[in-house]
């Protein structure tokens, strides 16, 4: 099967059907978060917890010193993320019948992928790929500011280039 998205346009939001891995044709509502949206808190919380569980500078290295404790990682990363998200584009993947139910999101800045996340119960339905395509990042080499083992597992055929300074200093 080829990977494709069919869309139904609605005012400012899109319902997409990623047909490649979504046999049941589960619709996905793609939308931007509102400034006071509780989804922003979900984005910050899930992003920080993932980074604490899978620190980007950790894998593939031998540990000579213990990693920072999770509470410190979460606190410091939350500070970084609050700066990043105001300059970035966030797209939420939601339940079309309940736009407040968020299944996942992507955060990008132009051709830079900051982070992509899909709740574990909704992985394998093509939501992550749909979010990645919605970000408009060119195929092939992809610049990322955050790297996690989950990212490389979910997208094994994409060549990622990690630039952690983009996470700290922005674009």
Regions found by a protein language model. Give the residues of each.
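Short, solvent-exposed loop/turn segments that connect beta-strands within catalytic domains
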Residues: 22-24, 96-101
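Conserved acetyl-CoA-binding loop-helix of GNAT-fold acetyltransferases
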Residues: 121-138
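Short, Lys/Arg-enriched N-terminal segments with co-localized hydrophobic residues
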Residues: 1-9
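Hydrophobic adenine-recognition pocket in adenosine-nucleotide-binding enzymes
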Residues: 33, 116-121
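Active-site rim helix/loop that mediates acceptor-substrate recognition in acyltransferases
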Residues: 61-90, 95-97
């Amino acid at each position: 099967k080829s990977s494709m998205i069919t869309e139904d346009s609605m005012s400012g939001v899109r319902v997409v059907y990623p047909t490649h891995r979504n046999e049941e044709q589960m619709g996905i509502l793609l939308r931007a978060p509102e400034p006071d949206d509780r989804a922003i808190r979900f984005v910050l919380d899930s992003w920080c917890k993932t980074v604490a569980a899978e620190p980007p500078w950790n894998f593939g290295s031998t540990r000579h010193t213990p990693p920072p404790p999770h509470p410190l990682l979460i606190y410091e990363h939350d500070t970084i993320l609050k700066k990043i998200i105001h300059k970035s584009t966030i797209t939420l993947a939601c339940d079309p019948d309940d736009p407040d139910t968020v299944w996942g999101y992507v955060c990008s800045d132009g051709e830079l992928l900051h982070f992509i996340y899909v709740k574990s119960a909704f992985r394998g339905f093509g939501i992550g790929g749909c979010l990645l395509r919605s970000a408009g990042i060119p195929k092939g080499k992809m610049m990322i500011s955050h790297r996690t083992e989950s990212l490389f597992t979910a997208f094994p055929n994409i060549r990622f280039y990690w630039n952690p300074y983009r996470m700290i200093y922005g674009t």
